UniProtKB/Swiss-Prot annotation:
A zinc finger (RING-type) spans 648-687. SMART domains: RING. Its main location: nucleus. One of its GO terms (molecular function) is zinc ion binding. Residues 39-78, 178-383 form a coiled coil. Keywords: Chromatin regulator, Coiled coil, Metal-binding, Nucleus, Transferase, Ubl conjugation pathway, Zinc, Zinc-finger. Its EC number is 2.3.2.27. CDD domains: RING-HC_Bre1-like. Residues 1-28, 102-131, 224-261 are annotated as: Disordered. It comes from Yarrowia lipolytica (strain CLIB 122 / E 150) (Yeast). This is E3 ubiquitin-protein ligase BRE1. The gene is BRE1. It is found in: Nucleus.
Length: 700
């Protein structure tokens, strides 16, 4: 900023001529007090420059603050409006998607419910904290949501948009583009004018600084000019009273130089240009503010009066709204019909389910009875098969016994025949009466022949008996052997049967133990099945109750949705009314702010005028005193006067080393600190308030 001012002051000095900074020969030697006074005045001029810049920056800051507040209000209003639009779009799009989602099957619905329940158990919802303005992430999410809703809505009603609607929309877009271009041109023009005004303001500040330097009495003293000329240049030339004083006090020696006149003319020209530019800027800003206000707050009546396309679009919007309402009514009717069909379907399913369960229980009881009969039949079959096998074994034994008895009968027959032949032989021997003796020597030949004959017959009979006896012996031996083999076979079979019986007993006991375990397990399973059936019945009852509650909640939700839509419409009307009242209130507040600023400016001008009048009165008194002293010719008194100017005006004992930033008056640090400690926080010269931060240390 300092470099910019230096450059502008240098350029202004170059334009006003190089003679303004020509070195002059001092009328008298310059003392240290003159140098100190020159430094003080240089610091005071710098402080005046800073004060002007501070006032300008404060005004700019106030203007920018007002613009920022207006922009924040507009941003909040637009954000609220977009939230309402997003909610309305979400409501409309959600209704259509709800109609589509009702076409799902029952199985898919169950799967989705299961997945949703599982997802709800894993989810942890985090409620976002409230914020003032929306962040970039929230704006992106809102933009994505609105874009998706718009795309869905356009897909739903895209086929119903006619060509005429599209042409009207294109016309509106073209008109909006033209207005945006005009606004852009006006903004560029305002920026150029602001830049030009800033340049002129910088030149004005540089010229004011230059003028303050030329008005400095110390500079004129160093450059060889009189004190009277210095006092006259410090007066306010715009006040008629001070002009009269100047006319009475002016002399040929106190007239302005040519450089000062040229500089004043340049400053006057620049001030006139600044006033013209300020007037143009104010007019353009007023026009731009009116244009922006009109663009931001275009009412429907203005659009309907000046835009046929908007009127047609409004009518089409009302038609589409009516169609949407009709579709919503038809959707509600279809939803009610679908709910009735769902109830009928649920009742039919419950009836079928009850019949199925009843039939299933009957079949299960029949199956259990059939299984019991099957077990009983299998047990009887096993018993019959065992009896049959025993009877078959008994019959086989009987057959073998019969065969052996038959063989024994044949042996008996042979034995009987043999015995009969023996009996016949013995009978014959008895009939013949021949006595056989062992003494052969005393017998005759006939007796011997008879004995031989008898012996021969006996021998023959014995020989005839021997085959029968042999056959009987052989058969008896065979029967004995067969009997022995049969006994051995029976013993072996008995051993095998005993072993098999032991194995069968083990298997039987193992089977019985397994049967007991299976019976216990079966009892447990039956108990579990009973509990499961009870749980299933309870779950079915809970499901029926839940479905009834869901139906009631859906009906309540539909009622709440309709009520919410009505409340949204009412809220929309209230919002429009609030927006109108807010607009009126903002206008009144702006007007009130303008009046306050004007009052503040008038008060500032009045205080500046009073300060300037007091300063001129003090300068007049000082000059009068200097003239009186100069008439007596006391240079020491002049030095004392300069010393009194450099001393603090409050205590008159300390040098001025502390300046106040708010007004530029200089005092000693002790007096300024004493006034702050005593809570007298106003400048004793101009009564402007100051604080600890407004103290500026000055080094002379």
């Amino acid at each position: 900023m300092e470099d910019k001012r230096n450059a502008e002051s240098a350029s202004l000095g170059a334009s006003s001529g190089g003679d303004s900074k020509r070195a002059r020969v001092a009328a008298r030697p310059v003392s240290l007090e003159d140098v100190a006074e020159f430094q003080k005045e240089a610091i005071f001029r710098a402080m005046e420059t800073y004060r002007r810049e501070k006032e300008t920056l404060e005004k700019q800051l106030e203007t920018q603050g007002e613009k920022e507040r207006e922009l924040e209000e507009r941003v909040v209003r637009l954000g609220t409006w977009w939230d309402k639009v997003a909610d309305r779009l979400a409501l409309v799009v959600g209704k259509y998607e709800f109609e589509k989602s009702k076409v799902k099957t029952e199985d898919v619905k169950k799967e989705e419910d299961t997945e949703r329940d599982a997802g709800d158990e894993d989810e942890v919802e985090v409620a976002p904290g409230p914020t003032g303005l929306a962040t970039d992430l929230e704006l992106e999410e809102k933009s994505a949501s609105i874009s998706s809703h718009f795309s869905t809505l356009l897909d739903l009603i895209g086929d119903k948009i006619s060509k005429q609607d599209k042409t009207e929309v294109s016309r509106l877009s073209a008109g909006y583009t033209d207005m945006a271009e005009q606004r852009h041109l006006l903004v560029r023009k305002i920026q150029d004018l602001e830049h030009e005004a800033q340049t002129m303001k910088n030149q004005y500040l540089a010229a004011a600084k230059k003028l303050d330097r030329y008005k400095s009495p110390t500079v004129k003293l160093i450059e060889g000019e009189d004190v009277e000329e210095k006092a006259e240049e410090n007066g306010d030339q715009k006040t008629a009273q001070m002009e009269e004083k100047k006319e009475t006090e002016d002399s040929p020696d106190t007239k302005d130089t040519g450089d000062t006149k040229a500089l004043r003319e340049t400053i006057q020209v620049q001030e006139e240009q600044m006033k013209e530019l300020d007037a143009k800027i104010a007019a353009l800003e007023h026009e731009a503010s009116l244009f922006n206000a009109k663009m931001a707050d275009l009412s429907e009546s203005d659009l309907l009066d000046h835009s046929g396309a908007f009127k047609a679009a409004k009518e089409q919007l009302s038609d589409k709204t009516g169609q949407i309402l009709a579709l919503e009514k038809s959707r509600d009717a279809i939803s009610a019909e679908k709910m009735a069909l769902d109830e009928n379907r649920q009742q039919y399913r419950s009836t079928i389910k009850r019949e199925f369960e009843k039939r299933e229980s009957e079949l299960r009881s029949q199956l259990s009875r059939a299984e019991t009969d099957l077990v009983r039949i299998r047990t009887a079959r096993d018993e019959i098969l065992a009896d049959l096998s025993q009877k078959k074994a008994t019959e086989a034994d009987k057959l073998k016994t019969i065969e052996s008895l038959k063989e024994l009968g044949e042996v008996y027959k042979l034995r009987i025949g043999t015995l009969e032949s023996e009996v016949q032989r013995w009978r014959k021997e008895g009939n013949e009466g021949v006595n056989m003796s062992s003494n052969v020597e005393g017998k005759s030949l006939e007796e011997l022949k008879k004995e031989v004959t008898v012996l021969t017959l006996t021998n023959q009979s014995l020989m005839a008996e021997i085959p029968g006896m042999e056959a009987a012996f052989v058969s008896a031996q065979k029967m004995a052997e067969n009997k022995a083999l049969d006994v051995a076979d029976r013993e072996s079979r008995l051993t095998k049967l005993l072993a098999e019986k032991a194995k069968a007993d083990e298997k039987y006991f193992a089977a019985m133990r397994h049967k007991d375990a299976l019976g216990a397990e079966n009892a447990k399973l039956k108990a579990q099945m009973v509990k499961s059936s009870e749980l299933v019945n309870q779950l079915q009852e809970v499901d029926a109750k839940t479905r009834a509650k869901i139906d009631v909640l859906e009906k309540t939700l539909s009622e709440y949705v309709s009520l919410h839509a009505k409340q949204q419409e009412a809220a929309k009307r209230l919002t429009s009314q609030v927006a109108e009242k807010t607009h009126m209130l903002n206008g009144a507040q702006k007007y009130l702010t303008t009046l306050k600023e004007e009052m503040k400016q008038q008060g500032t001008k009045l205080s500046v005028g009073e300060h300037r009048a007091r300063k001129l009165a003090l300068d007049n008194a000082k000059l009068t005193k200097q003239i009186e002293l100069s008439s007596f010719g006391g240079s020491s008194d002049e030095i004392d006067e300069l010393r009194s100017i450099a001393m603090c005006s409050l205590c008159s004992k300390n040098w001025k080393d502390t300046a106040l930033k708010v007004c530029g008056h200089v005092f000693c640090h002790q007096c300024a600190q004493d006034r702050l400690d005593a809570r007298l926080r106003k400048c004793p010269n101009c009564n402007k308030p100051f604080s600890q931060n407004d103290l500026l240390t000055v080094h002379l």
